[in-house]
């Protein structure tokens, strides 16, 4: 079972690496494409979390050293705490809103103390304190889903695509939290959800870029028609 789990994990990590490099290249070629920048960060965070969880599963039967376990658990917690605000940052760029960006800043401020706790506190104290972060994570998920639903109802293009991806991610994150605390479930579901989220949101960025290029091309052709009419 562990070998099969590692195959799924390796597949997701490979997918994340390829898509992250692709969107990083898009951002480097066009620095105004902040959606690709945020999505690259998201891919890296999910990749780090998947990698650390799979490594902890590998080390578990062999009783890892305190240093290895401490490093893995800290990195895993950090990726989890940064993921929520990063998703909000991505959504706020793809579907701009002043009010939602304020919520995104508040999410980073609320997550900052927990990020510091994950870096500096002991593992035992950290595990107890960080349980309260689930409430903050739930608020981040709920606010994002409500905002994307609002965008969809207002007719924002591709908002429903973004909502579907975030719903899948929310299900994966919720399952991950329960699974990590000993509730019955399968680690595969989290991997599936993360993979679907990455593919859906990557499609969203590609669809938005294609739509923008079509609008530019249409404007160019309209201008050519006007010039021909004046000649």
Stretch-by-stretch model annotation:
Residues 2-30, 131-154:
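First transmembrane helix
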Residues 24-27, 51, 224:
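Short linear motifs in intrinsically disordered/low-complexity regions
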Residues 33, 46-222:
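Interfacial "cap-and-anchor" motif at the non-cytosolic start of specific transmembrane alpha-helices
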Residues 224-231:
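PAS/LOV and related PAS-like sensory modules
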Residues 38-41, 114, 200, 226:
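A generic membrane alpha-helix/interface feature
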Residues 31-45:
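Alpha-helical transmembrane segments of integral membrane proteins, especially early/N-terminal helices
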């Amino acid at each position: 079972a562990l070998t099969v789990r590692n195959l799924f994990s390796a597949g997701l990590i490979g997918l994340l690496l390829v898509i992250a490099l692709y969107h990083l290249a898009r951002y480097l070629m066009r620095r105004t494409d902040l959606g690709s920048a945020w999505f690259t960060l998201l891919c890296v965070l999910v990749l780090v979390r998947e990698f650390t969880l799979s490594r902890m599963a590998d080390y578990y039967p062999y009783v890892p050293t305190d240093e290895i376990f401490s490093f893995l658990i800290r990195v895993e917690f950090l990726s989890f705490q940064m993921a929520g605000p990063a998703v909000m940052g991505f959504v706020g760029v793809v579907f701009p809103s002043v009010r939602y960006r304020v919520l995104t800043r508040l999410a980073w401020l609320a997550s900052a103390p927990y990020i510091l706790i994950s870096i500096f506190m002991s593992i035992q104290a950290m595990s107890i304190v960080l349980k309260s972060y689930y409430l903050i994570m739930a608020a981040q998920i709920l606010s994002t889903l409500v905002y994307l639903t609002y965008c969809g109802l207002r007719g924002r293009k591709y908002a429903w695509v973004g909502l579907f991806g975030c719903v899948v991610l929310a299900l994966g994150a919720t399952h991950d939290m329960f699974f990590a605390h000993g509730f019955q479930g399968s680690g595969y579901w989290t991997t599936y959800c993360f993979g679907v989220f990455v593919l859906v949101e990557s499609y969203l960025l590609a669809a938005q870029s294609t739509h923008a290029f079509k609008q530019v091309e249409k404007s160019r052709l309209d201008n050519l028609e006007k010039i021909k009419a004046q000649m």
